[in-house]
């Protein structure tokens, strides 16, 4: 479909995206070692851009502008949606698209504290949304059942229900983890290594890196580099964070897979610990059937695994 052709309707775009996502997920599931190339054409495919735009436009942040001062309403009323998407697609195809710094705002919290809010430009949000449409079905094939945060068809209540169930199954200790400044501290090089396990398309890898390095424009007007972490408030950030934090999921899943129900009973009789991980984004618990010393050892083990991603 060329830039002069009519853009697909919303229904047509959703159907095409779902069809391609289903194929990507199936291919990733069938071959756990497959590295995907030739994905950059999907990022600028009209159907993917239409779906990405609709998701950005329907988001509650659509009325908020990034560093360029443009909101989703401005795009609709002044630029025209098709022209906006056509211009964005042309830049992506010509490889002249460059993410802009994230606009930072400090939001008051109860108790006098403030939290940082990052606001990307509408253009950057659309490209991030399109990237997510392509990458998510691939990495979903690898994500473990113990991960519940920011995943399709999963929610916090599911994680809570799993914890309640496991707590009724002889798990006596709970190791609670809250990863310090997770979204700010993830190592770019370590994250890049994990993305490259599945993605061989240099254009896609370059786009991901460009968003990671886009920088932040503070309220004082000063621009700061982003040498660690995922884009503040970015549509792509939860997926990238899950890719990084799945290092913990994989570590525990690998250990769990080696232990059959009979072996777990044998471990219990021998005084060895049995344990399960439940993670929701940057919060996790390890439920332990064993002693306090064993629970503390698993806490240290978790910290060591997360340390490989620059986290503590």
What is the role of each PLM region?
Residues 52-56, 130, 207-212:
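Short alpha-helical scaffolding segments that buttress acidic/His motifs in well-ordered protein cores
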Residues 62, 70-114, 125-133:
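A contiguous, low-structure linker/loop signature
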Residues 75-76, 121, 286-290:
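Short beta-strand-to-loop capping motifs
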Residues 91, 100-101, 110, 142-312:
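Conserved polymerase palm-domain catalytic core
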């Amino acid at each position: 479909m060329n830039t002069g052709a009519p853009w697909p309707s919303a229904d047509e775009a959703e159907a095409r995206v779902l069809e391609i996502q289903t194929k990507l997920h199936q291919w990733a599931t069938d071959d756990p070692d497959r590295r995907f190339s030739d994905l950059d054409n999907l990022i600028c495919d009209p159907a993917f851009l239409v779906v990405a735009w609709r998701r950005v436009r329907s988001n509650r942040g659509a009325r908020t502008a990034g560093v360029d001062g443009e909101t989703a309403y401005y795009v609709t009323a002044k630029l025209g949606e098709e022209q906006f998407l056509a211009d964005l697609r042309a830049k992506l195809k010509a490889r002249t698209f460059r993410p802009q710094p994230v606009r930072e705002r400090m939001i008051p919290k109860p108790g006098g504290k403030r939290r940082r809010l990052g606001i990307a430009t509408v253009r950057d949000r659309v490209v991030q949304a399109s990237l997510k449409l392509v990458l998510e079905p691939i990495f979903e094939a690898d994500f473990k059942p113990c991960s519940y945060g920011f995943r399709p068809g999963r929610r916090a209540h599911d994680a809570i229900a799993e914890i309640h169930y496991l707590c009724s199954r002889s798990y006596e200790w709970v190791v609670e983890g809250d990863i310090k400044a997770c979204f700010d501290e993830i190592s770019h090089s370590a994250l890049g290594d994990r993305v490259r396990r599945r993605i061989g398309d240099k254009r896609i890898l370059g786009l991901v890196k460009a968003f990671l390095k886009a920088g932040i424009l503070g309220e004082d007007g000063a621009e700061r580099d982003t040498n660690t972490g995922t884009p503040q408030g970015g549509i792509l950030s939860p997926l990238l964070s899950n890719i990084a934090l799945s290092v913990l999921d994989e570590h525990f899943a690998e250990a769990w897979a080696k232990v059959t129900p009979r072996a777990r009973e044998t471990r219990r009789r021998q005084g060895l610990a049995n344990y399960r991980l439940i993670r929701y984004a940057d919060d996790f618990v390890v439920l332990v059937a064993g002693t306090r010393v064993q629970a503390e050892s698993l806490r240290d083990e978790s910290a060591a695994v997360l340390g490989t991603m620059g986290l503590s």
